[in-house]
Regions:
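Single conserved hydrophobic/aromatic residue that forms the stacking wall/gate
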Residues: 1-7, 11-12
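Auxiliary Fe-S-binding modules of radical SAM enzymes
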Residues: 12-126
Length: 126
């Protein structure tokens, strides 16, 4: 397995434009536990710290990294078009310009003792 994703069950919480609008979303703790289990089961996999966990908890992406995630995906789309693909309500970083988002994300990752690497990030078998 080259990549795994956990977080979508949290995205449905309060997402008024989805069929899941009235469903209860998952918890951050459950998501972090699943990230940790995926890391133990797949030591080389790319596992993202999603914007969904950052939307649910102000330090959610940092917590996901510390739980085993190893990928972050900044929102680099122009601010003017982001409203066209809001997957869930109150999505993190929708108003920040790409450079602002990158600077903020870099500081957040450094605050937990890691740094962002900007190479291609291809899956590698070790």
């Amino acid at each position: 397995i080259s990549a795994c994703l956990v977080g979508s069950e949290m995205c449905i919480r309060d997402s008024k434009d989805t069929v899941f609008a009235k469903e209860t979303g998952g918890s951050l703790d459950l998501t972090l536990n699943l990230v940790a289990m995926l890391r133990l089961m797949n030591p080389n996999a790319m596992i993202p710290a999603t914007t969904a966990v950052g939307t649910i908890d102000p330090r959610g992406r940092e917590k996901a990294i510390l739980s085993g995630a190893n990928v972050v995906m900044p929102n680099l789309s122009p601010v003017s078009v982001r409203k066209n693909y809001m997957l869930y309500d109150n999505k993190l970083c929708t108003g920040d310009e790409a450079a602002e988002c990158r600077k903020c994300l870099d500081a957040r990752i450094r605050s937990i003792g890691y740094e962002i690497v900007t190479d291609r990030g291809d899956y590698r078998e070790f």
